[in-house]
Amino acid sequence: MRTIKKNNEYKIQRYISRGAGRWVHLYDYGSGISPTLECLNELKSIGYKIVATTPHEKYIKLSELPLDCPMALVFGTEMDGISSEVIDNADYFVKIPMYGFTESYNISVAVALTLQSIRNRLENENISFDLSKEEQIKLKIKWATKIIRDGDKIEQEIRRRLMEKTK
């Protein structure tokens, strides 16, 4: 998960969702001239399409969003929506259907609705979205080093010993 800190600090609450925040890898962008552009450019450089949620721009329905490549979903704030930097750099704009008088969902609701819609499509269209075995192993190693005391040192020692064995 990538967070862009402009006006507010983002901090995972330790006790929410029974500690699920420990298993989310956070990339923080909050310093520099343009943290938003830094984040978007980094994502694009590793093959991600930028998908911005908005009720105003030209948009496609979530059901029409191409699912053939990695995507980064961008959600704006309830007050201001997405920034002009996101508008200028997004590959797609999607609109979350809303009914009634307001044009805004709480951010957690917007994320949940969007992810559920995409997940349903992936399953219904039999699109594989699982991590590869190699990606799973790398992630498990990363998690293990987080929960074991001196996990980084232990990982380095294991890697050193494995390298010695292969010589």
Please state what every model-predicted region is.
Residues 2, 30, 77, 94-101:
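Short beta->alpha connector loops at strand-helix junctions that form conserved
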Residues 1-58, 115-167:
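RNA substrate-binding interface of SAM-dependent RNA methyltransferases
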Residues 70:
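Conserved catalytic motifs of the protein kinase core domain
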Residues 66-67, 86:
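Structural alpha-helical scaffold elements that stabilize or flank donor/cofactor-binding regions
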Residues 81-87:
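SF2 helicase motor core recognition
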Residues 87-132:
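Structured adenosyl-cofactor binding patch, chiefly the S-adenosyl-L-methionine
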